[in-house]
A protein has these predicted regions:
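Enzymes that bind and transform nitrogen-containing heteroaromatic metabolites
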Residues: 1-198
Length: 198
């Protein structure tokens, strides 16, 4: 069975909102772009490495729209752009009707948990999710996330959307910790499940 891997940029206080710029100002969030002072080539290399382990993306509508607007216009021959365009993408949305923004995209409108379980049962590499806080929370509540790859940035934002859902205890096991020179640390966790449940 394939794994669902959540890949997030996160502050020390667990905030994942708007790491790249002003892509998400919900709740009056004004601190977008907080990853850039810490970004470096080694993080780029890690991102390429992690994408090579994924052959399907699962995204919420807002993340899908932001990514599509960034990756689809990239010129043919750009390695990252070509890979992201070719990768099958599933976008969870009850309102999206047009997927022309980003090729190879399919909308999941209903029965989300059942559809995700069916995707996991298909052969292939990992299914990757980034951003998409509402979707990540729903999958966590149904114990469908198999791994969290958290790039923890050395700052406290004080508020914003968080990686983990409120009110739910989760026991995780650290399987990798990798520091980067800028102070960012990759923390790779897997849920601790009953023996034989994985």
């Amino acid at each position: 069975m394939r794994k669902i891997v959540v890949q997030e940029f996160v502050s020390l206080d667990g905030v994942m909102q708007a790491p790249g710029d002003k892509e998400d100002t919900d709740g009056g969030f004004t601190q977008g772009g907080w990853v850039w002072p810490y970004w470096e080539d080694e993080i780029d290399a890690y991102m390429g490495e992690s994408m090579s382990e994924v052959d399907t993306c699962l995204l919420g509508r807002k993340t899908w729209q932001n990514h599509g607007a960034a990756f689809e216009p990239m010129p043919e021959g750009d390695p990252l752009g070509d890979m992201m365009k070719a990768t099958p993408k599933y976008v969870v949305s009850t309102t999206l009707t047009d997927t022309s923004l980003w090729r190879n995209s399919t909308v999941i409108r209903d029965n989300v948990i059942e559809r995700v379980r069916a995707l996991k049962a298909q052969p292939g590499k990992n299914i990757g999710i980034d951003g998409s806080s509402v979707l990540v929370h729903a999958l966590a509540r149904h114990d469908l996330v198999d791994q969290y790859n958290l790039l923890v940035f050395p700052l406290v934002l004080g508020g914003g959307k968080r990686v983990f859902p409120e009110g739910q205890r989760m026991n995780l096991r650290l399987v990798e910790s990798r520091p980067f020179p800028s102070g960012v640390v990759l923390m790779r966790y897997v849920p601790m499940r009953a023996e034989g449940a994985e």
